[in-house]
């Protein structure tokens, strides 16, 4: 996958994704993270592997988030966005990837994590079904999405305040 990512980046994938997000008035860094976290939960449920940060977040989600940051701060380019904001965007990207991937995987019968827990509990003599494990994971995944959304909406609020003081 890395050669394909390199080719896509060479031909402007990052720039085009940032341009698209800049044009969407409703797109903010926080909202983008919420949507991405929900997307990762869904892919985890379906058992789809995106291989995480290097092939997906860095070349696609991060430039889109920076584009949303540019729109929030009224910056013509990423160089105009404060460096601390860029670092916070990287952290938010990592958080949304990790929250969605980790908890989303526990909602699928075909993911190794849930099968490992099932195997260990069965080996220890507990009577448990894979379905029960998935059912217990649903509230935890829901809580992670809600708390992640709160975290990302607070990030948006903070960015709006910073943008208002810098203009």
What is the predicted role of each segment?
Residues 1-62:
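Membrane-embedded alpha-helical segments and adjacent helix-loop junctions characteristic
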Residues 23-28, 85, 127-132:
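Juxtamembrane/transmembrane-helix boundary motifs in multi-pass membrane proteins
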Residues 9, 66, 122:
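Short polybasic/polar patches that bind polyanions
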Residues 25, 68, 72, 124-125:
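A broad structural signal for alpha-helix termini and local helix breaks/kinks
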Residues 35-118:
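Alpha-helical membrane segments and immediately flanking helix-loop junctions
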Residues 49, 53, 121-167:
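Juxtamembrane and boundary regions of transmembrane helices in multi-pass small-molecule transporters
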Residues 2-5, 36-44, 114-120, 136-153:
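Hydrophobic core segments of alpha-helical transmembrane domains in multi-pass membrane transport
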């Amino acid at each position: 996958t890395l050669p394909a990512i390199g080719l896509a980046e060479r031909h402007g994938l990052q720039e085009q994704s940032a341009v698209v997000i800049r044009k969407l008035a409703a797109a903010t860094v926080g909202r983008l993270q919420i949507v991405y976290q929900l997307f990762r939960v869904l892919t985890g449920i379906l058992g789809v592997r995106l291989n995480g940060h290097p092939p997906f977040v860095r070349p696609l989600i991060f430039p889109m988030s920076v584009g949303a940051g540019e729109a929030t701060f009224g910056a013509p380019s990423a160089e105009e966005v404060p460096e601390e904001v860029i670092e916070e965007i990287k952290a938010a990207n990592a958080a949304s990837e990790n929250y969605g991937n980790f908890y989303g995987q526990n909602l699928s019968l075909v993911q190794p994590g849930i099968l490992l827990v099932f195997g260990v509990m069965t080996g220890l003599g507990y009577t448990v079904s894979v379905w029960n494990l998935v059912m217990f994971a649903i509230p935890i995944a829901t809580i992670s999405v809600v708390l992640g959304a709160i975290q990302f909406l607070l990030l948006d609020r903070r960015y709006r305040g910073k943008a208002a003081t810098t203009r």
